[in-house]
């Protein structure tokens, strides 16, 4: 059956609804839990790592509330093929950088970046062979920053501590 396209306002209030997540209620209830109880060990083992099927295993891996929100955001964003939610900004930054960087690559990062992002670059990424080059966020010569090993650039505008605004070309 062909579904009539929804208006943006309708999509906003209905996106992410799945009967498998909502049960008899209209919207997914808010799950405030990190741990889920199982009737027996066999049920626990069957649930491990299977969040993709909508089965709650452990809060850090998501919950029906989070899956519903991710589905809703994907539905509302034209051309999106999936949404990832993270519990913190640095977790999102780490996942994004780890998805594109490999040993030998260079990461460009503004010198006013959030301290946990700098710690990630100077610690974790460095141990895996990724070099980070910091630059003045007020630069006007972005071309001079790049070389053949540059794989990613992390910009913060405004900067988290100094609030400099970058003029990104």
Predicted regions: what is each one?
Residues 159-169:
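Active-site core of PLP-dependent enzymes with the aminotransferase class I/II
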Residues 35, 40-91, 117-123:
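Conserved N-terminal alpha-helix of the aminotransferase class I/II PLP-enzyme fold
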Residues 132-138:
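Short acidic-hydrophobic, aromatic-tinged amphipathic segments that line or gate anion-handling sites
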Residues 75-77, 98-101:
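Glycine-rich helix-loop-beta junction characteristic of Rossmann-like nucleotide cofactor-binding loops
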Residues 24, 73, 92, 107, ...:
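Buried hydrophobic positions in well-ordered alpha/beta secondary-structure cores of metabolic enzymes
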Residues 99-116:
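Conserved PLP-anchoring active-site segment centered on the Schiff-base-forming lysine
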Residues 1-53:
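N-terminal glycine-rich, Lys/His-bearing helix-loop that initiates the first secondary-structure elements
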Residues 139-150:
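Short amphipathic alpha-helix with an adjacent loop that forms part of the alpha/beta core around
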């Amino acid at each position: 059956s062909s579904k009539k396209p929804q208006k943006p306002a309708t999509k906003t209030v209905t996106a992410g609804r799945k009967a498998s997540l909502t049960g008899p209620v209209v919207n997914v209830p808010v799950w405030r839990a990190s741990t889920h109880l199982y009737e027996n060990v066999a049920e626990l083992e069957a649930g491990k790592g299977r969040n993709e099927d909508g089965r709650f295993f452990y809060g850090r891996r998501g919950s029906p509330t989070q899956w519903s929100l991710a589905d809703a955001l994907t539905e509302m964003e034209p051309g999106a093929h999936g949404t990832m939610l993270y519990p913190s900004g640095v977790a999102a930054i780490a996942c994004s950088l780890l998805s594109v960087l490999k040993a030998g690559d260079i990461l460009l990062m503004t010198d006013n970046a959030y301290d946990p992002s700098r710690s990630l670059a100077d610690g974790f990424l460095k141990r895996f062979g990724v070099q980070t080059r910091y630059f003045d966020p007020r630069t006007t010569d972005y071309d001079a920053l790049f070389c053949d090993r540059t794989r990613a650039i992390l910009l913060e505008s405004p900067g988290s501590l100094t609030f400099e605004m970058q003029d990104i070309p």
